[in-house]
Amino acid sequence: DFASRWLIPRLPDFLALHDDIEISFATRLKPFDLSREHFDLAIHFGTENWPDAEMELFCSETMIAVASPEFREQHTINEISDLLKVPLLHMESRPKVWQDFFEQAGLSSEDALAGKYFDQFSMVIAGAVASLGAALIPTYLIEREISEGRLVTLAASTITTKNNYFLVRPTETYSDHVALFVQWMKNNVGR
């Protein structure tokens, strides 16, 4: 989801400035030997646990409560406690994030684990757009849906998860091209 919803939509800007740089993408679910598999850079979500590599914090994951405008109209949501009364959409890899969100607001959250569960954020986003429920989604994944009005925020409060995004490089020296790409990513993280 990070690559398809944040990185790739911004990539034409980088390639317009650096058309001599070739970029390829591959998905891995676990840390691997970057040098042996000929990777210059990896983007890792999780904790700082990649052996034999140089890890640099890229950004944290901040999530915001959203739903479709129709869902918000159908359910009276004026404050965070109102979200305890509506269907909630969950991401399987972050099963307790709603519970943490409510507890952060000082609310009891026994019902926060109920609702529909999905294994990809793209499905959670589609479910929220389809008015299946309220969702906690990383802000960077829903920039387009928010700007187009297909999703609206339900509370000013956000929650930052315990995991982060890291830029991971082999421990040996990396090329100027990788350095340019890393700097470009850092410059674009807040945009």
Describe every region a protein language model picked out.
Residues 12-15, 99, 143, 182, ...:
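Solvent-exposed, non-membrane alpha-helical residues enriched in polar/charged side chains
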Residues 6, 138, 173-187:
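Short amphipathic alpha-helical coupling segments at ligand-binding clamshell hinges
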Residues 1-51:
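Central regulatory/effector-binding core of bacterial HTH transcription factors
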Residues 5-6, 75, 162, 176:
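Residues that form or flank phosphate/diphosphate-binding pockets in enzymes
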Residues 14, 23-25, 127, 151, ...:
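Hydrophobic packing within well-folded, soluble alpha/beta domains
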Residues 32, 36-38, 48-132, 137, ...:
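C-terminal regulatory
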